Curated annotation (Swiss-Prot):
<keyword id="KW-0963">Cytoplasm</keyword>
<dbReference type="InterPro" id="IPR004100">
    <property type="entry name" value="ATPase_F1/V1/A1_a/bsu_N"/>
</dbReference>
<dbReference type="Pfam" id="PF18269">
    <property type="entry name" value="T3SS_ATPase_C"/>
</dbReference>
<comment type="subunit">
    <text>The core secretion machinery of the T3SS is composed of approximately 20 different proteins, including cytoplasmic components, a base, an export apparatus and a needle. This subunit is part of the cytosolic complex. Forms homohexamers.</text>
</comment>
<dbReference type="GO" id="GO:0016887">
    <property type="term" value="F:ATP hydrolysis activity"/>
</dbReference>
<dbReference type="GO" id="GO:0005737">
    <property type="term" value="C:cytoplasm"/>
</dbReference>
<dbReference type="Pfam" id="PF02874">
    <property type="entry name" value="ATP-synt_ab_N"/>
</dbReference>
<dbReference type="Pfam" id="PF00006">
    <property type="entry name" value="ATP-synt_ab"/>
</dbReference>
<keyword id="KW-0843">Virulence</keyword>
<comment type="function">
    <text>ATPase component of the type III secretion system (T3SS), also called injectisome, which is used to inject bacterial effector proteins into eukaryotic host cells. Acts as a molecular motor to provide the energy that is required for the export of proteins. Required for type III secretion apparatus (T3SA) formation, proper protein secretion, host cell invasion and virulence. May play a critical role in T3SS substrate recognition, disassembly of the effector/chaperone complex and unfolding of the effector in an ATP-dependent manner prior to secretion.</text>
</comment>
<protein>
    <recommendedName>
        <fullName>Type 3 secretion system ATPase</fullName>
        <ecNumber>7.4.2.8</ecNumber>
    </recommendedName>
</protein>
<dbReference type="InterPro" id="IPR000194">
    <property type="entry name" value="ATPase_F1/V1/A1_a/bsu_nucl-bd"/>
</dbReference>
<dbReference type="InterPro" id="IPR013380">
    <property type="entry name" value="ATPase_T3SS_SctN"/>
</dbReference>
<dbReference type="InterPro" id="IPR005714">
    <property type="entry name" value="ATPase_T3SS_FliI/YscN"/>
</dbReference>
<dbReference type="GO" id="GO:0046933">
    <property type="term" value="F:proton-transporting ATP synthase activity, rotational mechanism"/>
</dbReference>
<dbReference type="InterPro" id="IPR050053">
    <property type="entry name" value="ATPase_alpha/beta_chains"/>
</dbReference>
<keyword id="KW-0813">Transport</keyword>
Length: 442
């Protein structure tokens, strides 16, 4: 009899879990793709629900993403395997929340904020909802100070400000992850929050161990939802990472938030929206995607005390402006770095296209001499690009254009300035000295 007691207690616990006073249970009436239609449950939009078997066993959780007449539309956080018409749906009366605290540093979480690094539960007593309002624009502090990154081309020519939101636009395979690793190691911040959305499973550990490194991980929180995870988890990863960054910002810290990538976040939102019955609009994206982008991106930036400086990567399909996500994000953020496949083919890294990239706040955070030197280098580089073909075929005549002559004489020094080994970081003062020497009297 005593041997059966643990089993009896487990059964009773399950039954009690299904008999909570005041709860109403819903029933799954239809499964359409990745969406559940549930009847008989009183829930609100964004509420988390539990999906349980009749004996009380928890199968998984889901979020309410819409309504259709008297039915609630739920997006499960995991696989649909095991669900049936006998599955009970229980609203928890709250949205998804994530644990926050100093114990998060050095940890790796999944897209729902659960630990996925095998190091056990996170010792945090505070939980915050992953959805929050952006700071009041009239209470935000101004962006007034540079935030050195250790990447020479960025610090010198498109200087990042503390609290700035910068986009990294690039095709696949031109060094986005490597550049993010350099930012994580070299940026002078207190905490890194790194969000990986839709990545290949192989790349996650490679990024953490080979690119980020042990020292970088020690002051970082990594949130990861790989490409095989559900669309709702991939989408929620962006909000989980942002909520964690907000927690540290609200405590007066300087936070670096890096999200790879916004494109995969938008695609996950598209899957959810289309499954819920939204009409497709630009390139198949429903209206909710374009509504969610500013809600997410405006949460970063300066706060009343701390700051969130953010990098968001965007998979740019082409340069014709036909990519609606790239176009929308470019209009929201405070600047953009364009990574070029042509520059990468020349073995020049970081493969940033200087003439196409821009920091919207650089002019208000750097001194006049710095701004002038950066402008001179851009002018020389633009002029050299104009005459490069003539130089290569031997048709350029020395003395025909004074600026072109200067650009040709200095192009090797300029290229040395623009290139940087991925395992080396450049001090901000050294970057400014080198920039001045390259452009002096130009």
């Amino acid at each position: 009899m005593l041997a059966e007691t643990p089993l009896l207690e487990t059964t009773l616990e399950r039954e009690l879990a299904t008999l909570a006073v005041g709860r109403r249970y819903g029933k799954v009436v239809e499964v359409v793709g990745t969406m559940l239609k549930v009847a008989g449950v009183q829930v609100s939009l964004g509420e988390v629900c539990e999906l349980r078997q009749r004996d009380g066993t928890l199968l998984q959780r889901a979020e309410v993403v819409g309504f259709s007449r008297d039915l609630a539309l739920l997006a499960p956080f995991g696989e649909l395997i095991g669900l049936s018409r006998e599955t009970r749906v229980i609203g928890l009366g709250r949205p998804l929340a994530v644990p926050v605290g100093p114990a998060l540093l050095g940890r790796v979480l999944d897209g729902l904020g659960e630990p996925s690094d095998g190091q056990g539960a996170i010792a945090c007593d505070t939980w915050v909802p992953i959805q929050a309002q952006a700071p009041d624009p009239m209470r935000r502090r101004l962006i007034e100070h540079p935030m050195p990154t250790g990447v020479r081309i960025v610090d010198g020519l498109m200087t990042l400000g503390e609290g700035q939101r910068m986009g990294i636009f690039a095709a696949a395979g031109v060094g986005k992850s490597t550049l993010m690793g350099m930012f994580a190691r070299g940026t002078q911040c207190d905490v890194n929050v790194i969000v990986l959305i839709g990545e290949r499973g192989r790349e996650v550990r490679e990024f953490i161990e080979l690119i980020l490194g042990a020292d970088g991980l020690a002051r970082s929180v990594v949130v990861c939802a790989t490409s095989d995870r559900s669309s709702i988890e991939r989408a929620k990863a962006a909000y989980v990472g942002t909520a964690i960054a907000e927690y540290f910002r609200d405590r007066g810290l300087r936070v670096l938030l890096m999200m790879d990538s916004l494109t995969r976040f938008a695609r996950a939102q598209r899957e959810i929206g289309l499954a819920a019955g939204e009409p497709p609009t630009r390139r198949g994206f429903p209206p909710s995607v374009f509504a969610e982008l500013p809600r997410l991106l405006e949460r970063a930036g300066m706060g009343e005390s701390g700051s969130i400086t953010a990098f968001y990567t965007v998979l740019a399909e082409d340069d014709t402006g036909s990519d609606p996500i790239a176009e929308e994000v470019r209009g929201i953020l405070d600047g953009h770095l364009i990574l070029s496949r042509e520059i990468a083919a020349k073995n020049q890294y970081p493969a940033i296209d200087v003439l196409a990239s821009l920091s919207r706040v650089m002019s208000q955070i750097v001194p006049y001499d710095h701004s002038q030197a950066a402008g001179r280098l851009r002018r020389l580089l633009a002029k050299y690009n104009e005459v490069e073909t003539l130089v290569q075929v031997g048709e350029y005549r020395q003395g025909s254009d004074a600026v072109a002559d200067e650009a040709i004489d200095r192009i090797d020094a300029i290229r040395d300035f623009l290139s940087q080994p991925t395992d080396q970081l450049s001090a901000y003062e050294n970057t400014l000295e080198l920039l001045t020497s390259v452009t002096d009297d130009a």
